[in-house]
Regions:
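Catalytic cores of DNA base-excision repair glycosylases
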Residues: 2-213
């Protein structure tokens, strides 16, 4: 199967069957989403959503968080993975938002990556979800699904995967395609024993069509 045919089939199926796809993190503004995405690194969205209501209540703006300390933030986020590092990142992020960006979460990916705790994946999430830019954030789900389906040619890194996906996915579909792949990887194309029989992508899936599934 030609790659163009595979992409067309996969994207058309998602567009028809999953017309609405969005992040499962709870937030009301760009600042809150930035916090949630930083916290979600190697942690489930469910766990993050359990702690962010109190965190958002007590630190409603970058200014308030910047005036706090990592020790105080730690007590709010201690149940997530790596709370010590993340508490330092959050305070540092808030301080830089105030000092360099007038308290406004930037839309530029390079600018976002200057913030403590913000790598390329997080920057792409913010650019895509908040500002609807054609940025493809590659997490473990996107990386796995893209390779398994055959959207990428055995990409070895998230950056390789990102570049190949944005090359083939129409620009206007990149923001929602990010969510399609994440949700598909989270609930259907899971890491171990993917639920192939209930998957609608079988006609185009390289893994399913392979005589030897690995």
């Amino acid at each position: 199967m030609r790659k163009e045919e595979r992409y067309k089939g996969v994207l058309n199926w998602f567009n028809e069957h999953v017309p609405v796809a969005e992040t499962e993190l709870h937030y009301d503004n760009p600042y809150q989403l930035l916090i949630a995405v930083i916290l979600s690194a190697q942690c489930t969205d469910k766990r993050v959503n359990m702690i962010t209501p109190a965190l958002f209540r007590d630190f409603p703006t970058p200014e308030v968080m910047a005036a706090s300390t990592s020790e105080v933030i730690f007590e709010h986020i201690r149940s997530v993975s790596y709370p010590n590092n993340k508490s330092k990142h959050l305070v540092g992020m808030a301080k830089m938002l105030m000092s360099d960006f007038d308290g406004v979460v930037p839309s530029d990916i390079d600018e976002l990556q200057k913030l403590p705790g913000v790598g390329r994946k997080t920057a792409n999430v913010i650019a895509s979800v908040v500002y609807n830019k054609p940025a493809m954030a590659v997490d473990t789900h996107v990386f796995r699904v893209a390779n398994r389906i055959g959207l990428t040619n055995n990409s070895k890194t998230p950056l390789e995967t990102e570049k190949e996906l944005v090359k083939h996915i129409p620009e206007e579909q990149i923001p929602i395609a990010h969510h399609w792949l994440i949700l598909h990887g989270r609930y259907t194309c899971i890491a171990r024993k993917p639920k192939c029989e209930e998957c609608g992508l079988k006609p185009w899936c390289k893994y399913f069509l392979s005589p030897k599934k690995t």
